[in-house]
Amino acid sequence: MATYSASDFRSGLKVMLDGDPCAIVENELVKPGKGQAFARVRLRNLKTGRVWERTFKSGETLEGADVMDRDMEYLYTDGEFWHFMEPDSFEQYQADANAVGDSAKWLREQDKVIVTLFNGSPLAITPPNHVELEIVETDPGLKGDTAQGGTKPATLTTGAVVKVPLFISTGEVVRVDTRTGEYLGRASK
């Protein structure tokens, strides 16, 4: 794997630090008037999600992480693992609850997702930014409910609960932003 010196660091670069794959979130190269230049770096551990700050002298190097983002299709869950398939090679991967995390509430069978692989095993799952899901349970809308007003909780087919306007009723398909969990609007037919 490639090695990167402190002057090569940039946001999004994936490196190995203390045996764990990390992504550089922020990078600032500091050149003081006296002394050696250094890089002040914010890193996010890809396994745990923890973010911390480290300082590297200009001569220090880090090894690149063997991390790849792949487009895959979500197949099914068997209760313990979530199964994904690469559409080109039909190779299948199984991810545990740590890798899937909060993404589980947005996954439907045959959805396209981005799977982050580390040494051939799934490390993280990223669902599409927007999904269209049907509402299976919500309070009934009453005559006179308008778009200007309050919201009510609605349960979607995947089990996720989002706040929707009062005029939305059970059985409707809505667009939801998976990053924030916010209602975006009714799905276009």
From Swiss-Prot:
Post-translational modification, as annotated: May be beta-lysylated on the epsilon-amino group of Lys-34 by the combined action of EpmA and EpmB, and then hydroxylated on the C5 position of the same residue by EpmC (if this protein is present). Lysylation is critical for the stimulatory effect of EF-P on peptide-bond formation. The lysylation moiety may extend toward the peptidyltransferase center and stabilize the terminal 3-CCA end of the tRNA. Hydroxylation of the C5 position on Lys-34 may allow additional potential stabilizing hydrogen-bond interactions with the P-tRNA.
Family the entry assigns: Belongs to the elongation factor P family.
Subcellular location, record wording: Cytoplasm
Signal peptide per UniProt: none
Function comment: Involved in peptide bond synthesis. Alleviates ribosome stalling that occurs when 3 or more consecutive Pro residues or the sequence PPG is present in a protein, possibly by augmenting the peptidyl transferase activity of the ribosome. Modification of Lys-34 is required for alleviation.
InterPro entries, per the entry: Elong-fact-P_C, NA-bd_OB-fold, Rib_uL2_dom2, Transl_elong_fac_P/YeiP, Transl_elong_KOW-like, Transl_elong_P/YeiP_cen, Transl_elong_P/YeiP_CS, Transl_elongation_fac_P
Record-level GO cellular component terms: cytoplasm
Modified residues (N6-(3,6-diaminohexanoyl)-5-hydroxylysine): K34
Superkingdom as given in the UniProt entry: Bacteria
The protein's name: Elongation factor P
Keywords, comma-separated and alphabetical: Cytoplasm, Elongation factor, Hydroxylation, Protein biosynthesis
Gene Ontology MF terms in the entry: translation elongation factor activity
Pathway: Protein biosynthesis; polypeptide chain elongation
GO biological process, one term: peptide biosynthetic process
